[in-house]
């Protein structure tokens, strides 16, 4: 009965309760073992079931292997000894084959000569094995199993029984040949035990790890030679001696580890302690840990700590302490800006990380702030309190809300106040669409901008180049729109941009200079350098483009080109023939002289510059001009910088978006594709795009609409912010200037560029007394909505440029009593508005000295007043004129002369040297020696 394993004992070994009995029976069925509540198993069956439950290794039990009877022969104790090792799942199932002595066996066909039985040394102790290894492969049947201390202890007891059984086996073999098979089985079991011991030895060379170490009380003794026939028991070493050896061994190993040896060398110890090695137990293997729980009550183990990794633990503690110290330093307290004392109790409870008396000393890294940022966004990005930011701006004289935008100056002031390092970034870069330009750069035509002073013949010169007449069709003979044209010369194309020369079109000239490759400055030889000429040169210099001078009107008599060159040389533009680097080409727009020379110079300069661009991919263009045309809607003149713009492409330009419907060149011909440096008029826009905006082609309408909406929202919020944000100075000025006279106007123009020029010119007329208030401006005709905007305002005017109101609009204007003024020349519009502002302004009052009289005597007349007897010392004293009464050089009174008499007669005036009587209006405090000084006021009109 001692050889069978009871199911209840099996559960106890597993550490399971009776409630889990059903699960164990079910798992036994999976490997072909039928069990009941009171069943018993052979050790081999128990070992396989144990491995299946704990390790998940499924080994089927053959059906022809019946459970053994408890009343079996005592020889089964040999199997019990080995099965007890299998029960602990730690022994390898692939032992080596062992040679045995050959004996006559009737049931075996292949037999080998059996050698003398190998003596098995008794184990002195368990060997601790590492559960997991680095870079270990999953366990297989060839992987040695791990044997614990208690398992080896039990195995030793069984080995003693095996020795006794072997002696009995020899006797039984001699007496009864029928028991040969049983003896053979016993020998096999003995060989299995020997192989188990060999597998245990294989783990002795495992590298030691840092962590926990388990020291065993017993030691293992090497087996004697396998060829020895006799068996001898080795004497057991005492526990004190084992611990002494372990202590010496670990002292030596720790010394070696202190030298940072890669592998600890084997310590030289007594033979009993040579193979005693301890290894790190890895608790990450929950399966093995669970399997060893049943041996927790063993008392023959000592758990020691390996402090090899103590330095790592100390390092983590130091890092944690450093982080805590940093947090303590950053934790600051709010500073009260209104008093030197600390805050009141209520405020002191609010411990915010950014508030501290030393908060301004905290060094912060550079913070990226958008160029257009709201107050609350600035606070978030700078990690500041919103209330502190608003309060700081308030103390600086700026009243803002959290949604107001901050300008660049305000951002810099806040950064200085809070001791921040910031970098201001362009907000519009967030809206930029990433353009992927891949392809080969090809040669493109040069873009030439014609600039110069008004009436110097720019458009006439371009007309001569194009063999067209444009100048005569423009009102007043001056260019008021930006034009773009393509000209072919020597099989090469040149794109020309014609800019206005009037002072009101400064921004147009700037846009033309930004997109150009070469600037041609037209100067009239009979007029010389003018203000707009200098401005055009500044635009070209800012754009860093080469300049070619065209001396126009050379057909006129008495022209002096050397004088013109001298004026340009004073500005730093020296001619080539004077040793400089700038070409001065004499031309005549009237006769055409010098035109070919000018074009050749342009092409030579373009060849030197090697102008190239990528033609493949989405287009990127610049809007030169935008307008609204009847029947076509919003249109725009664009020049392509890179890529190709085709009919049907989706695009966006600032707040405008759409799909290209048609493209028309300067000759009025329809084209399908627009390559770099080419210009065309496109249709299909949702609205008129701002002049100078960048047009970008995208994949579809959805992307174009989304990008345009983002920009529209941003610009709208920015405009609202500017309308609400006001400083103390502006507020006080508004209160003081409540009598400010202004003229509300609505401006409508035919193109975006003209509208922009008119607005800028009118705003320059504003001064401290009168101002033009632009209520609304737009491109297109005058509508009823425009009338309703100004109907409630006094002195409101609607200004139209190159447009005419319809009959319905005229009738509504009469009904609303609104004045509509239309112009075709920008000169007339600006001059009339200047005159209108001058009429609202108070005149300039000047004084003119007329005479002076000295008081010699005074006469008090009852019910009349005091009459001063005077002698006129200078000029003429007239009745009704204004006079000052001066006493000791101080003006005592200012009033009018009510009565002037010569003796008893009333007179209008008294000349120098004559006596007269003077009585002032409502003033009688006149004394002898006072002086009357008379003057008259002269009103003069103001000028703007």
Swiss-Prot record:
Region named G2: 477-481
- Quick one: where's region G3? 498-501
Q: Where is the sequence biased in composition, kind Low complexity?
A: 175-185
GO CC list: cytoplasm; cytosol
Q: Which GO terms describe its molecular function?
A: GTP binding; GTPase activity; translation initiation factor activity
Q: Where is the composition biased (Basic residues)?
A: 204-215
Give the region (G4) as residue ranges. Answer: 552-555
User: Sorted alphabetically, which CDD domains does this protein's record hold?
Assistant: IF2_eIF5B (cd01887), IF2_mtIF2_II (cd03702), mtIF2_IVc (cd03692)
User: Quick one: where's region G1?
Assistant: 452-459
Q: Does the keyword Cytoplasm apply?
A: yes
Return the Polar residues bias intervals.
Answer: 132-150
Where is the tr-type G domain positioned along the sequence? 443-612
Q: Which residues bind GTP?
A: 452-459, 498-502, 552-555
Q: Where is the segment annotated Disordered?
A: 61-157, 173-281
Q: Any idea which UniProt keywords this protein has?
A: Cytoplasm, GTP-binding, Initiation factor, Nucleotide-binding, Protein biosynthesis
Return the annotated region ranges for G5: 588-590
Positions with biased composition (Basic and acidic residues): 186-203, 244-259
Q: Which GO terms describe its biological process?
A: translational initiation
HAMAP family, A to Z: IF_2_B (MF_00100_B)
Family label: Belongs to the TRAFAC class translation factor GTPase superfamily. Classic translation factor GTPase family. IF-2 subfamily.
Functional description taken from the UniProt entry: One of the essential components for the initiation of protein synthesis. Protects formylmethionyl-tRNA from spontaneous hydrolysis and promotes its binding to the 30S ribosomal subunits. Also involved in the hydrolysis of GTP during the formation of the 70S ribosomal complex.
- The identity of this protein, by name, is Translation initiation factor IF-2
């Amino acid at each position: 009965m001692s050889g069978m394993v009871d199911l209840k004992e099996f559960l106890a070994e597993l550490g399971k309760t009776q409630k889990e009995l059903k699960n164990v029976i079910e798992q036994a069925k999976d490997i072909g073992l039928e069990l009941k509540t009171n069943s018993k198993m052979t050790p081999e069956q128990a070992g396989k079931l144990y491995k299946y439950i704990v390790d998940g290794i499924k080994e089927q039990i053959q059906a022809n292997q019946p459970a053994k009877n408890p009343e079996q022969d005592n020889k089964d104790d040999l199997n019990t000894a080995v099965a007890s090792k299998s029960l602990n799942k730690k022994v390898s199932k692939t032992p080596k084959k062992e040679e045995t002595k050959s004996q006559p066996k009737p049931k075996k066909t292949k037999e080998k000569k059996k050698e003398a039985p190998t003596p098995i040394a008794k184990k002195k102790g368990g060997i601790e094995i590492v559960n997991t290894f680095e870079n270990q492969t999953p366990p297989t049947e060839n992987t040695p199993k791990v044997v614990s201390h208690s398992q080896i202890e039990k195995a030793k007891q069984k080995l003693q029984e095996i020795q006794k059984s072997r002696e009995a086996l020899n006797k039984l073999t001699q007496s009864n040949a029928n028991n040969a098979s049983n003896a053979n089985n016993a020998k096999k079991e003995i060989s299995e035990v020997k192989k188990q011991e060999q597998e245990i030895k294989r783990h002795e060379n495992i590298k030691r790890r840092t962590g926990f170490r388990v020291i065993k009380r017993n030691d293992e003794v090497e087996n004697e030679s396998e060829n020895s026939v006799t068996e001898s028991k080795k004497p057991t070493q005492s526990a004190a001696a084992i611990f002494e050896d372990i202590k010496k061994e670990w002292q030596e190993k720790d010394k070696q580890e202190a030298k940072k040896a890669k592998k600890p060398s084997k310590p030289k110890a007594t033979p009993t302690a040579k193979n005693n090695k301890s290894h790190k137990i890895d608790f990450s293997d929950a399966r093995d840990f669970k399997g060893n729980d049943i041996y927790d009550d063993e008392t023959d183990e000592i758990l020691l700590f390996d402090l090899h990794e103590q330095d790592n633990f100390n390092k983590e503690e130091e890092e944690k302490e450093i982080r805590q110290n940093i947090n303590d330093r950053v934790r600051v307290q709010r500073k009260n800006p209104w008093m030197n004392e600390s805050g009141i109790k209520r405020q002191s409870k609010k411990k915010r990380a950014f508030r501290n008396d030393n908060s301004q000393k905290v060094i912060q890294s550079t913070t990226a702030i958008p160029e257009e940022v709201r107050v609350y966004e600035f606070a978030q990005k700078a990690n500041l309190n919103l209330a502190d930011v608003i309060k700081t701006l308030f103390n600086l004289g700026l009243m803002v809300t959290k949604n107001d935008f901050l300008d660049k100056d305000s951002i810099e002031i806040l950064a200085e106040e809070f001791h921040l390092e910031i970098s201001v970034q362009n907000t519009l870069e967030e809206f930029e669409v990433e353009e992927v330009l891949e392809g080969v750069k090809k040669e493109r035509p040069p873009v030439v901008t014609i600039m110069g002073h008004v009436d110097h013949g720019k458009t006439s010169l371009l007309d001569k180049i194009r063999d067209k007449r444009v100048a005569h069709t423009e009102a007043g003979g001056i260019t008021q729109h930006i034009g773009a044209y393509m000209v072919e010369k020597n099989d090469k194309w040149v794109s020309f941009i014609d800019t206005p020369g009037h002072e009101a079109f400064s921004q147009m000239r700037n846009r033309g200079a930004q997109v150009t490759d070469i600037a041609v400055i037209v100067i009239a030889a009979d007029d010389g350098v003018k203000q707009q000429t200098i401005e055009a040169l500044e635009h070209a210099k800012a754009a860093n483009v080469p300049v070619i001078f065209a001396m126009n009107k050379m057909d006129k008599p008495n022209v002096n080109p050397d004088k013109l060159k001298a004026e340009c040389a004073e500005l730093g533009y020296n001619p080539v023939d004077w040793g400089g680097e700038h070409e001065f080409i004499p031309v005549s727009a009237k006769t055409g002289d010098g035109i070919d020379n000018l074009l050749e110079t342009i092409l030579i300069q373009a060849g030197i510059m090697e102008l190239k661009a990528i033609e493949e991919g989405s287009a990127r263009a610049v809007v030169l001009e935008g307008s609204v045309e009847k029947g076509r809607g919003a249109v725009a003149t664009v020049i392509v910088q890179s890529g190709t713009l085709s009919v049907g492409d989706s695009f966006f330009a600032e707040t405008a978006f759409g799909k290209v419907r048609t493209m028309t060149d300067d000759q009025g011909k329809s084209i399908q594709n627009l390559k770099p440096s080419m210009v065309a008029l496109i249709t299909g826009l949702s609205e008129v795009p701002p002049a100078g905006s960048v047009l970008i082609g995208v994949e579809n309408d959805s992307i174009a609409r989304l990008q345009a909406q983002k920009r529209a929202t941003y610009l709208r919020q920015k405009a609202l912010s500017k309308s609400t944000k006001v400083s103390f100075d502006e507020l006080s000025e508004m209160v003081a200037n409540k009598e400010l006279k202004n003229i509300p106007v609505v401006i409508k123009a035919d193109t975006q560029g003209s509208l922009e020029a008119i607005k800028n010119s009118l705003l320059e007329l504003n001064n401290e007394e009168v101002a033009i208030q632009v209520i609304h401006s737009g491109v297109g005709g005058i509508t009823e909505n425009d009338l309703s905007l100004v109907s409630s305002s006094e002195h409101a005017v609607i200004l139209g440029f190159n447009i005419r109101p319809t009959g319905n609009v005229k009738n509504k204007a009469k009904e609303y009593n609104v004045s509509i003024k239309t112009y075709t020349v920008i000169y007339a519009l600006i001059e009339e508005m200047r005159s209108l502002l001058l009429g609202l302004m108070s005149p300039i009052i000047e004084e003119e000295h007329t005479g002076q009289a000295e008081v010699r005597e005074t006469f008090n007349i009852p019910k009349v007043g005091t009459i001063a007897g005077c002698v006129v010392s200078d000029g003429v004293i007239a009745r009704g004129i204004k006079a000052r009464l001066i006493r000791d050089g101080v003006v005592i009174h200012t009033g009018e002369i009510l009565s002037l008499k010569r003796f008893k007669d009333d007179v209008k005036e008294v000349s120098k040297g004559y006596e007269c009587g003077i009585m002032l209006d409502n003033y009688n405090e006149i004394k002898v020696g006072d002086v009357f000084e008379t003057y008259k006021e002269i009103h003069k009109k103001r000028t703007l």
